[in-house]
Structure formats: C-alpha cells, structure tokens
C-alpha cells in the first residue's frame, strides 16, 4: 500500500490518498479529504488501470479527465499526487517527497 497526504496551498484543504494494488494491472484508491470537490472526484475514482494511466497523454488520463470535471481550479495539486501514488504502488518509481516551495525574491 502507498499512502500520500496533500495539504493544498491557499484553500488549506487536506487529502489523504491510499493506493493499493488490487491485481496485476489495477490500483484501488481510497480518499479521505476535507475538500468537497476532491470528494466528488473520489466518489468516481475507485480504481485505475496502471498501464493506461502511465501510457496516455496527461489530459487523457482518467485522473485528469475526472479532475477537469470536479476540481475547483487548474492549479490543484491533488491530481498529480494521485498519479504519484499510482507510480509508487505500481513500482514504477520509488516513493520520494515532492514539494512546491515559493522563494522570496532574490533567492
């Protein structure tokens, strides 16, 4: 099982994503979130086909297709976190922390 926690920026919402290999080609997803928009996405996004999500263009993934429908703004980082959890659970990439850090001017 792979689990990630996301705290979004300005909206201050939190989401926990649990990815668990359900068979050789699929990962099951479970979400706990404070965001009503991500909850709507989670209600539909129960399982992902690993090969399909990793082989199509970004906007053709099931994650971003549903994000386009439910997420409140384009800069939401939760869809990227879902794909990261999928990659780790499928043993495509090792788990590694990701960050977005805003720097002060001149740094």
Predicted stretch roles:
Residues 1-30:
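Basic/polar, acidic-poor N-terminal "presequence/leader" segments
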Residues 2-3, 11-13, 55, 59-64, ...:
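Aromatic-enriched hydrophobic runs in primary sequence
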Residues 4, 17-19, 63, 99-106:
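Generic preference for hydrophobic/aromatic residues in regular secondary structure cores
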Residues 80-107:
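C-terminal charged interaction modules
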Residues 23-83, 93-94:
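Active-site- and interface-proximal helix/loop "cap" or "latch" segments in soluble metabolic
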Residues 10, 35, 86:
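Glycine-rich beta-alpha junction loops
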């Amino acid at each position: 099982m792979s689990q990630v926690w996301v705290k979004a920026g300005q909206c201050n919402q939190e989401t926990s994503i649990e990815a668990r290999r359900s068979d050789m080609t699929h990962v099951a997803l479970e979400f706990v979130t404070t965001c009503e928009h991500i909850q709507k996405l989670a209600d539909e996004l129960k399982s992902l086909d690993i090969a399909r999500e990793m082989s199509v263009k970004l906007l053709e993934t099931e994650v971003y297709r549903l994000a386009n429908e439910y997420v409140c703004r384009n800069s939401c980082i939760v869809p990227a976190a879902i794909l990261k959890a999928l990659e780790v659970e499928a043993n495509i990439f090792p788990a590694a922390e990701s960050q977005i850090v805003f720097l002060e001017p001149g740094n």
